Amino acid sequence: MDLLKQLEHPREELVLDNGLRVLVLPTPGRVSAAASLYVKCGSRFEEVSTNGLSHVVEHMVFRGSERHPTSAALNLAIEEHGAHVEATTSVDLTSYEVLGPRETVLEAMEIFAEVFRAPCFEGFDVEKQILKAEIEEELDEQGRSYDVSDLSRKQLYPQHPLGFAVSGTLANVARFTVADLQKHLARFYVASNAILAVAGDLRIDDVVAAAQRAFGDWRRGDPVVLETPSVAAKKPFVALDDPGGAQSDLRVAWRTVGARADDARPLQVVERLLDDGLAARLQKRVVDEKGLAYHVSAGADLFEDVGAFDVAASVAHGKAPTMVREALQMTRELATSVAPDAELDRVRRRYVWSQRALLDVPRDLASFYGSGRLLGLDETLASAVASFVDVDAERARAAAERVFGAQAFVACVGELPRSAERQIKAML
């Protein structure tokens, strides 16, 4: 495929003396740039008593540094360079993206890097109010979370932090102290547990010099060790009654292998066979032919060691059993029949184009390499696409069989009729 040749691009990977891995990804001609730090810190590394602490730390670093001791002062210093910072806490990583013009993004990065070495953590009580409001957005009047994604993950991975909500609990957030923040920062925010990826129309030497100034004296520390789930999921159906809503939120899910397993790439092919555009199987059958849902999606969420494959939909309460039946039928078809050549070729082409598009967006290019390296994936755009294209129809079918041939798990938040619950349970 000629497009594969277009995915080769310049890059430099190096390690600072303190163990921080740095990726430099030049994007000639692009006027915007991204300096992104990925830290292996998230809810899967927490305990019941510390659940939510990773998310709290992510909020609190924006409160300033010793040199810029307030949120306003920190943001002003960065925004004067035409840049801004975005951050996200996930299950297995926390990302910080300094986004700005290529001329000034490295200066903005150096300013923001101060918060990892010398955060001030001022205004914690004020920030707790914001965090409390964020959590309460997903709670019902009885204080129960109605986030179906959280409910599904808890169902798939019981008694393990992979089943925790990233935002934590109201009780934990109220109890956390500045000392807790400092302890968490000291454990996870260290050079050997992070990766810096910088993408833009920048000189490699300039990036390396800026990275050295910004992070060269960051403490080395130790990388985090994963604890792989060992407890089997035992509840095929869980539901939370949420009266008053017009629709029920559904997740039909399966446990999977992790991002480095042999089946990881075939599962990505399976994902795209099911849900890759409005012409894909899921949209065609569920929306166009059956009219069951307006919003429907499917995806493989692969962590370093394990993962999950979900079919998600919001449907009228009475249509929930039909939606579950269709999800089970469509995944069963993927497990028992090979995809037609024309369909597989379309999926391959669209994947190549989507990966090539990363070269146009520095932050997306940085994310591909930075988050991938944090998961232990030593791949490039070209090698990722080559391995995707190399998956034939039988290999995709076999991977689907290994996942969808196992127990399916259904989570639902909504006002399900009892008859609907019985129908769903009978399918499982």
Which sequence ranges carry the predicted segments?
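An aromatic/glycine/proline-enriched structural segment found at the starts
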Residues: 2-7, 12, 158, 162, ...
